[in-house]
């Protein structure tokens, strides 16, 4: 199988934010205790004209801009999300049409809770590495929902990132050294058809779910590559909240210098399928040639995908071709709880 790498990437975030204090105030909760417990200060809120498709399209267009390739050369488009706008009508087709990819390509919408985006990256790696196509695109994006008053309401956010995978070494922004996955049947978080909001197992979502899969996924990747945390310059993990992320990073031996760029949850919330892709995009925005990145996603149900990535010198040529994730984070406008309820369609008659 041929070596494959990232040849283009892009991200997108809504500009609206709501502070933890506004949510807590509406429910008579202690905002400071919640912020300390979750390590989340505020989260993104999609506007009334934003959904997973619009976020995916904008991310994909930015990825194409950085890649500098003809969109017609892309042979596959995958969009991973648990908040696709339609139950029956592919988001991937919308993205491809908006980006000028169609009609000569294959597409699919993916679901695996919060790791659907990284599952798409693995599929693209296989298709390009086997020489079935020249390029493939994977997007991870979500506009997540939490029931009013539930703990998820402080974290369920919106955002996404796209990655174009290719096999021409001279086009690599970053090279994949390897990937590894760890998957079980663990019912920590779920939502049935026709239900508006997901249910979760509370504390059960920690040790037997998130930590078991992220830590085993990470250890499996390191064993496969013969590495330790000291061999990497940066890392990013799935981040349902800041506390879980920091705990996982420290258990694996990573330092603040290694994990700081991947950690976006305190300022953004949990963007679900977009969480690890956004963290990786922010790392790439700050990385330099030969930096090595360790990536582990997590999707409830449950599974983790891990990646070992090395950045190339081409990164310096493409970063400034599009807006960075950090700049998107800085472009924000706060809304109160009433506007948040309106924008998220939570006021039901």
UniProtKB/Swiss-Prot annotation:
Claim: Acyltransferase is one of the keywords in the record: yes
Alphabetized CDD domains for the sequence: init_cond_enzymes
Residues annotated for (3S)-3-hydroxy-3-methylglutaryl-CoA binding in this entry: 30-31, 114, 155, 205, 238, 270, 300
UniProt record, GO biological process: farnesyl diphosphate biosynthetic process, mevalonate pathway; isopentenyl diphosphate biosynthetic process, mevalonate pathway
UniProt catalytic activity: acetoacetyl-CoA + acetyl-CoA + H2O = (3S)-3-hydroxy-3-methylglutaryl-CoA + CoA + H(+)
Residues that coordinate or bind CoA: 203, 243
Active site per database record: 82 (proton donor/acceptor), 114 (acyl-thioester intermediate), 238 (proton donor/acceptor)
Pathway: Metabolic intermediate biosynthesis; (R)-mevalonate biosynthesis; (R)-mevalonate from acetyl-CoA: step 2/3
Pfam families: ACP_syn_III_C
GO molecular function: acetyl-CoA C-acetyltransferase activity; hydroxymethylglutaryl-CoA synthase activity
Acyltransferase found in the keyword field: yes
Entry similarity comment: Belongs to the thiolase-like superfamily. Archaeal HMG-CoA synthase family.
Protein name in the entry: Hydroxymethylglutaryl-CoA synthase
Protein species of origin: Methanococcus maripaludis (strain DSM 14266 / JCM 13030 / NBRC 101832 / S2 / LL)
